[in-house]
Design a protein with these regions (language model features):
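Short coil/turn connectors at secondary-structure junctions
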Residues: 1-2, 102-103, 130-132
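N-terminal glycine-rich phosphate-binding loop and ensuing alpha1 helix
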Residues: 2-59
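Residue-level signal for inorganic ion chemistry
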Residues: 6, 33, 90, 110, ...
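Short glycine-rich anion-binding loops that position phosphate/pyrophosphate groups of nucleotides
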Residues: 10-13, 56, 82, 111-114, ...
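Conserved N-terminal catalytic core of the sugar/cofactor nucleotidyltransferase
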Residues: 34-103
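Short aromatic/hydrophobic "clamp" motif used to bind/position activated sugar donors
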Residues: 106
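Conserved core of the sugar-phosphate nucleotidyltransferase
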Residues: 115-183
Length: 183
């Protein structure tokens, strides 16, 4: 079984939106969150989706899922105080309601990251099967530096040895559950 957990429990403070959290900002008549969900909805290898959402926005999300015919979202759980807690809330819901096997895969994805495609989801699933995990990463193109205790540039980091970790991040679900319980 391949399960997508989409976390969207944050308020988007840095975005400074006065009207709604950034995951519910609209683009072409749909929320950013729905654009993200659709990638997993339409992927043939994703069995179901769990969304961790701001508690006061769950009703809005349910209406949007219904309006656009989204069928793979099995549960919407309240988001937590942190991303980790939002993911853990979703994991607990899955564990309470599903008979999990050792080969069940979970893809963890940020609800405000809709710029993914079917191939990336497939590569994450295949990576878990081959290596035990799959973490999306891209090259570091910008110059990165370290700073000293005064905030002054100290050293330029060789970008050839740096990658930027992104989402989805994918694992065997039992391993993620165990790690979250220890955290």
């Amino acid at each position: 079984m391949n399960i997508a957990v989409i976390f969207a429990g944050g308020t988007g403070v840095r975005m400074n939106s006065q009207t709604r959290p950034k995951q519910f900002l609209e683009l072409h008549g749909k929320s950013i969150l729905l654009h993200t969900i659709e990638h997993f909805e339409f992927h043939p290898d994703i069995d179901f989706i769990v969304v961790a959402c701001l508690k006061n926005w769950i009703g809005v999300l349910k209406n949007e899922l219904y309006r656009f015919g989204i069928r793979k979202v099995k549960w919407i759980v309240p988001g937590g105080e942190t991303v980790q807690m939002s993911i853990y809330n979703a994991l607990q819901k899955i564990e309470e309601n599903e008979e999990l096997s050792d080969d069940d895969i979970i893809l963890l994805h940020d609800g405000v990251r809709p710029l993914i495609d079917q191939q990336l989801i497939s590569r994450n699933i295949e990576s878990v099967k081959k290596y035990g995990s799959g973490i999306t990463a891209t090259y570091q193109y910008e110059t990165a530096v370290t700073v000293d205790e005064n905030g002054y540039f100290d050293e330029v980091i060789d970008r050839n040895i740096v990658r930027i970790a992104k989402a989805p991040q994918s694992f065997y679900i039992k391993e993620v559950l165990e790690a979250h319980k220890k955290a």
